[in-house]
A protein has these predicted regions:
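Thiol-based oxidoreductase modules, predominantly thioredoxin-like and allied folds used
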Residues: 54, 77-93
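Juxtamembrane extracytosolic/periplasmic "stalk" immediately C-terminal to the first targeting helix
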Residues: 35-44
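A short glycine-leucine-enriched loop at secondary-structure breakpoints
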Residues: 97-101
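N-terminal targeting signals for export/organelle localization
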Residues: 1-34
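Non-catalytic, surface beta->alpha helical segment in thiol-disulfide oxidoreductase systems
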Residues: 103, 108-161
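Short active-site neighborhood of thiol/selenol oxidoreductases, capturing the structured segment around
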Residues: 45-58
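The canonical Cys-X-X-Cys-His
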Residues: 59-63, 107
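Typically the conserved alpha-helix immediately C-terminal to a functionally engaged Cys/Sec
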Residues: 40, 63-76
Length: 161
């Protein structure tokens, strides 16, 4: 590599980092709707079903599922709430542990009475390869899903999951 090629490599690398940073900023999940157990309890006892997406701002799958949650929220508008909880926070970890959701992305589905009726959790830390387990309120597997879709989230709220 000649002396002239080194600056070109550095510039190309710098541009790649800028583009990658821009993509990450555009796709990252952003702020949580739930920041405490009290926030979750208020939503759970609000008389409507609630879907809680547990995510991490550094989880690439969470970033790609962001639109999935938005589409489910649009479909369920007026009948259920779709909210987000950042798992790697103090409140997120406590809530995740209480409901057996330790990896992102995971989803908790509460009915209109505030009871956990379904949860969707990765089979392990690599859900892209292994998919997700759909669990009932007691933690028993009721089905599996290869990926999270708006239709899956909507069906879980409507009781078809």
């Amino acid at each position: 590599m000649g002396a002239a090629a080194l600056p070109a490599v550095v510039v190309t690398f710098a541009l790649d980092l800028v583009v990658l940073g821009g993509v990450w900023l555009a796709l990252r999940p952003g702020r949580a709707d739930i920041r405490s157990k009290d926030d979750l309890d208020r939503l759970r006892h609000g008389g409507r079903p609630v879907v809680v997406e547990l995510y991490s701002n550094f989880c690439l799958i969470c970033m790609s599922n962001r639109q999935t949650s938005k589409l489910a929220a649009m479909t369920l508008r007026g009948t259920a709430k779709v909210v987000r909880l950042e798992l790697p926070t103090k409140a997120g970890s406590a809530i995740g542990d209480a409901y057996g959701a330790r990896y992102t992305p995971s989803y908790l589905v509460f009915d209109e009475h505030g009871d956990l009726v379904r949860s969707v959790v990765p089979d392990n830390v690599t859900p892209l390869a292994n998919g997700y387990r759909v669990l009932d309120g007691q933690g028993a597997i009721v089905s599996r899903a290869q990926r999270i879709t708006p239709a899956l989230l909507v069906s879980l709220v409507r009781g078809a999951g």
